[in-house]
Curated annotation (Swiss-Prot):
GO terms for cellular component: cytoplasm; extracellular space; nucleus; plasma membrane. It comes from Drosophila ananassae (Fruit fly). Its EC number is 3.1.-.-. This is Protein hedgehog. The record marks H328 as: Essential for auto-cleavage. The lineage of its organism: Eukaryota, Metazoa, Ecdysozoa, Arthropoda, Hexapoda.
Length: 472
C-alpha cells in the first residue's frame, strides 16, 4: 500500500488546515475563508492526502483472512456444549517459552485496583452478607488448602478466582510432576490483611507449591499469569499473590458497552440517549477512512438497563467525556506514528489522543485525554451500526470489543449485516415499519441481554484467536 494512503491531513497539511468534515467539498483554514475550487492548483499528491484520513488500513494477510473466515463460519454451526474440565484454556499446548517473574515484579505493571488489573474494591464479604452466597467452594483434589482457621474459609472464593485457580493447578502438575498447588489463603473473614484487600471479597489467593521449593516460585507466578489471573505479584520469596476482577465485571470481557444515558447524534441533528435508540436509527459514525458519516443501527449486541457494570471514563481537554466498558475499542490518534488505531479503553492513558467531534464544524479532531478513571454504573447498551463505529458523547469509538482488531471484528459481524440487508428487502418488514401498531423500536425493547450471535463469537474466540489478540 502506498505510504501516502496512510498519511493524515492534520499531520501532513499545515496546522491551520482540517479535512475531517461531513462536507467533503469544504476545506477549513484559519488563513482563508474561501472554498477550495475543483480547478485549484492542488498537486495530485496533496489531493490524495486530503481524500484519505487517519485510519491506517491494515491489509490482512493470509492468517488474518483465515481467522476472519473462521469467525464467519463457526458461529453459524455453533451449538452449546458442556465441559468437565476446570475452565477455558485447559490442556492447551504451550506456544512459546515462558520466563519466570523476578522478585517484586507484578503483571500487569499497574496498581491492583485499576480497571486494567483486578479492578476497584467492592467491599468486604461477611458470612451474613447477601454477597456471601456468590462465593463458591473449591474441592479440586489437585489443590492443597492449608486452612489454618479450620473453618474451610480458604476453599471459598469468587467464581472467576476458582476458574483461574483450577487452570493453574493443572499447569503446575504439568510443569512439575508430583508437585501440587498450595493455597495458603483465599477468602479471609478475620481481617488479617489490612484495611483494603481483595482477600475479603474472595478475589485473591496467596499460593505456593506443595514442596515449598522457593526456586519454583518465579515460574509459578508466570504460570498464574498464563492461567488468566488479572493481577499477579511475586511479592515475597515465600509465596505468590494473585487476584481477579469481580464476577460482576466479567461481562466487560464478554462484550463492550456504553452507558444508557450516553448520547449519539441522529442524522436530523438531534442527540438521543443510547438507551432510547431504535433499530433503524441513523447515527453519527466514522468510516474506515476516518470520515464522519451517518450509519444505520442494525442490532444491539447487548442491552440491559438494570445490570451493574464497571466502566472506564475518559475525560478530554476539550470537555468530552466517554464512559465505556474496559474491553471496548476506542479510536486513538498516534502522533508519533502519524496514524489512527483502535485501543482497548482500559489501556488508554493520560496524554494520549482520541478523536472528538467539533461541534461547530462537524469535523473529527484529536483531543488529548487528561483524566482516566474507573466508575460503576447501572445499565449497558451496545448498538451495532453498519459501519461498525459510532460517535458517543462526541468521541469516536468502535462498536466492537474483546478483539484488538477493528477490521477482524467487522468481518466477524458480516453475516449480521447481510441478514439486515436481506430483511430490509422483504415487503413485510417495510409494512411493519410503517405501521403504527408495530413501532420501530419494539425489537430493541424486547431484547434483554447479549445477542445470540455476539455470544457465539465470544465462545469461539478462545479457540480461533491467539491470546495476544484478545482482551484478558
Amino acid at each position: 500500500m502506498d505510504n501516502s494512503d496512510c498519511r493524515v491531513p492534520w499531520a501532513s497539511a499545515p496546522s491551520s488546515m482540517t479535512c475531517l468534515s461531513l462536507d467533503p467539498t469544504k476545506c477549513h483554514s484559519s488563513s482563508s475563508s474561501s472554498k477550495c475550487q475543483p480547478d485549484c492548483d492542488t498537486p495530485p499528491a496533496a489531493e490524495k492526502i486530503q481524500r484519505h484520513i487517519a485510519y491506517t488500513q491494515r491489509c490482512p494477510g493470509k492468517i488474518t483472512t483465515l481467522l476472519a473466515v473462521l469467525l464467519l463460519v463457526l458461529p453459524l454451526s455453533f451449538t452449546p456444549a458442556h465441559s468437565c474440565g476446570p475452565g477455558r484454556g485447559l490442556g492447551r499446548r504451550r506456544e512459546r517459552n515462558l520466563y519466570p517473574l523476578v522478585l517484586k515484579q507484578t503483571i500487569p505493571n499497574l496498581s491492583e485496583y485499576t480497571s486494567g488489573a483486578s479492578g476497584p474494591l467492592e467491599g468486604p464479604i461477611r458470612r451474613d452478607s447477601p454477597k456471601f452466597k456468590d462465593l463458591v467452594p473449591n474441592y479440586n483434589r489437585d489443590i492443597l488448602f492449608r486452612d489454618d482457621e479450620g473453618t474451610g474459609a480458604d476453599r471459598l472464593m469468587s467464581k472467576r478466582c476458582k476458574e483461574k485457580l483450577n487452570v493453574l493447578a493443572y499447569s503446575v502438575m504439568n510443569e512439575w510432576p508430583g508437585v501440587r498447588l498450595l493455597v495458603a489463603e483465599s477468602w479471609d473473614e478475620d481481617y488479617q490483611h489490612g484495611k483494603e484487600s481483595l482477600h475479603y471479597e474472595g478475589r485473591a489467593v496467596t499460593i505456593a507449591t506443595s514442596d515449598r521449593d522457593q526456586s519454583k516460585y518465579g515460574m509459578l507466578a508466570r504460570l498464574a499469569v498464563e492461567a488468566g489471573f488479572d493481577w499477579v505479584s511475586y511479592v515475597s520469596r515465600r509465596h505468590i499473590y494473585c487476584s481477579v476482577k469481580s464476577d460482576s465485571s466479567i461481562s466487560s470481557h464478554v462484550h463492550g458497552c456504553f452507558t444508557p444515558e450516553s448520547t449519539a447524534l441522529l442524522e436530523g441533528g438531534v442527540r438521543k440517549p443510547l438507551g432510547e435508540l431504535s433499530i433503524g436509527d441513523r447515527v453519527l459514525s466514522m468510516t474506515s477512512n476516518g470520515q464522519p458519516v451517518y450509519s444505520e443501527v442494525i442490532l444491539f449486541m447487548d442491552r440491559n438497563l438494570k445490570q451493574m457494570q464497571n466502566f472506564v471514563r475518559l475525560h478530554t481537554a476539550g470537555g468530552a467525556v466517554l464512559t465505556v466498558t474496559p474491553a471496548h475499542l476506542v479510536s486513538v490518534w498516534q502522533p508519533e506514528r502519524q496514524e489512527l488505531t483502535f485501543t482497548f479503553a482500559d489501556r488508554i492513558e493520560e496524554r494520549q489522543h482520541v478523536l472528538v467531534r467539533n461541534e461547530e464544524t462537524g469535523e473529527l479532531r484529536p483531543d488529548q485525554v487528561i483524566k482516566v478513571e474507573s466508575v460503576r454504573s447501572m445499565g449497558v447498551v451496545a448498538p451495532l451500526t453498519r459501519e461498525g463505529t459510532i460517535v458517543v458523547n462526541s468521541v469516536a469509538a468502535s462498536c466492537y470489543a474483546v478483539i484488538n482488531s477493528q477490521s477482524l471484528a467487522h468481518w466477524g459481524l458480516a453475516p449480521m449485516r447481510l441478514l439486515s440487508t436481506l430483511e430490509a428487502w422483504l415487503p413485510a418488514k417495510d409494512q411493519l415499519r410503517s405501521s403504527k401498531d408495530h413501532p420501530k423500536d419494539s425489537s430493541a425493547e424486547r431484547q434483554n441481554g447479549i445477542h445470540w450471535y455476539a455470544e457465539a463469537l465470544y465462545k469461539i474466540k478462545d479457540y480461533v484467536l491467539p491470546k495476544s489478540w484478545r482482551h484478558d
